[in-house]
Regions:
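Catalytic core of pol beta-like nucleotidyltransferases
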Residues: 10-76, 84-243
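Short linear clamp-binding motif
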Residues: 1-11
């Protein structure tokens, strides 16, 4: 099986929640997190909060994404969100959002934490930001905020494949040409493309599935690396030293 087909097949809906993560995985309303997993996520969240700094107003710690839903696969990771009451920072809330976002990136880059082979990704989320995922589980309260629902939505893999190839070609061409403005434009368009899909169709929208494919295949990393290299080149100064 090709890598392309392997990733496409990973988008299929499973019959149960992931049994490594959940007790009673075949009944989402009664499903609870495996104690060993919950304890590990609690420890990781505590480490992340300490890294964010003093005076972090934590309201909850939640698991969201495919491992709290029926669309989990070998490519899944633990999306662990620390819910922060940003209103507590008053007029400095935007400053703290930027700070937490930067620290989130550094934390995830500098750590390689896995549970049962799945990566753990940390986020600091504003309490006012709505939960997009249909499956959201409170680690602190050990219960569902949003109970996951198995969907009967059929994914037209030919349509998805065409959309993926279109974006892959865009990225490959832009990376090959190395035009920083084009690269940044594609990066921004891709972000908006995914968000529009999440807003209109949720996690199983074609836009979000395209984004997931591009991330799992390494295309997004390639795009971001090219943007960074292009920026470095623009900011660098080359000077010929005359004898």
């Amino acid at each position: 099986m090709s890598k392309f087909q392997q990733i496409l097949n990973s988008f299929s809906i499973k019959e149960t929640l992931n049994p490594k993560v959940w007790e009673n995985p075949d009944n989402p309303k009664k499903a609870t997190m495996v104690p060993k997993v919950r304890k590990a996520l609690e420890r990781i969240a505590e480490e992340f909060v300490d890294y964010l700094g003093d005076n972090v107003f934590v309201e909850d710690v939640v698991l969201t994404g495919s491992l709290s839903n029926f669309n989990w696969s070998e490519f899944s990771d633990f999306d662990l969100h620390v819910i922060v009451d940003m209103d507590e920072y008053g007029d400095e809330d935007e400053l703290y959002k930027e700070l937490f976002n930067l620290k989130k990136q550094l934390f995830n880059t500098n750590h390689n934490i896995k549970i049962f082979g799945y990566d753990v990704e940390l986020y600091a989320q504003d309490a006012e930001e709505p939960h997009i995922s249909s499956g959201v589980y409170s680690i602190m309260n050990n219960g569902w905020i949003n109970v996951p629902r198995k969907t009967n939505l059929e994914i037209d893999k030919k349509v998805l494949e065409d959309k993926i190839k279109n974006w892959t070609e865009k990225i490959d061409t832009a990376v090959e040409n190395g035009d920083i403005k084009v690269l940044e434009s594609i990066k921004d368009k891709l972000k908006k493309y995914r968000q529009s899909g999440l807003d209109d169709g949720g996690e199983l929208s074609y836009e979000n599935l395209v984004f997931k494919y591009l991330r799992r295949s390494g295309n997004i990393e390639k795009l971001f690396d090219s943007v960074n290299k292009g920026t470095d080149k623009e900011l660098s100064v080359e000077r010929k030293i005359e004898d």
